[in-house]
């Protein structure tokens, strides 16, 4: 059934709609300075090829204006104790910067993109979205988007990028696009009776009761004083070779498991193999779009769900996968249960501001990797910089088609001020080791580990050895034997996902800190060999400027000018 009628016209003739429980929770999180940056969903696309910037601005503007959620304004109705929103506000106006003509340096543009990605929104006054088109040159353009999570989930991001693509092609051709007419987000939210919710909460609580509310991570925590508290994050990634991937997925298929379930099993197994815990609560995001009417609606329908995984001393990989499948199906069925109510029953001493029962999360990585405006203009998504994280550890799983076959890609997001990168890398290596054991010894007990091979040390003071090390990593990642030292990674067949893997492998092999932006600036084998000759300096956390575009532009140039 549809939700209760809107609260009607206010004295200013606005029509207000009740926010969902998830949106209300996000509105509360947005009031906390520490958690506020985690409520943003930034996307940066780098286009290579000719771009009609007038057409792109028109496409972005129309995409931002046509969806009610992206015009929303929020307020707290104190009398009803209800967060509510209206959708009759003006949409965000995309900005345009000709960085080449105005003499912006790469560093200044990077500063601006970081600021656009981190600056908060005033949910009461501003549209919960911003966009900037940045012309870098005749064949290079950036599109920086940022939308508040309160109106935008992972599915919405794909929809918005697709809208921009369709609208751009139509604008460039001088024709009207064919687009759907999405319903208002408030019209597709089902309202449930309190009695039904209470009964379902009781069932979930009964299923999860007794499991520890914490997960013991095998990662030493860095002691910090309160002034250093931050949720600035980083990501490490790896992927299994096609042969191992095929064997892993064949075993998973025998137990009816999806790639997501494989990720949960690998995480639980690795935690059990590296620590004393055997009973885990693991969070994951559920799309929440069971109603077909939500198919074309940009909005926040996602919910956080928790599943339970236990591991016995004699459980084989087949046993673990079967347990994960059953637990996952139970969690899917109860995905509409409010997590805050479950958390309150199981962990009354929790931080009420951030209620999930688990500090670890597993998600299927379905983010788009490319956005092609036209056949001659390709776009790839840049890695997030900055990245903000709410969980102690978030595992993302993706089954990727590559030229040499399907690869199971795994990435770990973590807070950089809490965990050392080397320790997280060790845990990622342990995840790979677990995957290899699953593929090779599925009938063996999970807690019976195979022997790990040792790596051969490389003399990083030897320029020839550094070059050969980087060449070997490129050959491994690109699946190519002939690697030129002076050709960029992307011209050699790399993409953004493989770049993330390259960052991880260079850091792992060299023992040096390697950053994604470093590889953009040193895209060749020879450049990266020089890069790992010395450890990279740690990047400073960017300060979140006010959301005003003029202030962001000025701040970006000020930072860049100070560095020159």
Regions found by a protein language model. Give the residues of each.
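Short, hydrophobic-rich beta-strand element in sensory/regulatory alpha-beta domains
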Residues: 69-75, 279-282, 516-517
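Active-site-proximal acidic secondary-structure segment that organizes catalysis
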Residues: 16-18, 134-184, 423-437
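Generic non-transmembrane alpha-helical segments
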Residues: 59-66, 167, 171, 251, ...
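Conserved small-residue
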Residues: 20, 67, 131, 149, ...
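AMP-binding/adenylate-forming domain of the ANL superfamily
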Residues: 14-31, 52, 106-112, 157-158, ...
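Regions immediately C-terminal to embedded phosphopantetheine-bearing carrier domains
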Residues: 1-30, 447-564
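Adenylate-forming
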Residues: 14, 24-33, 42-50, 60-62, ...
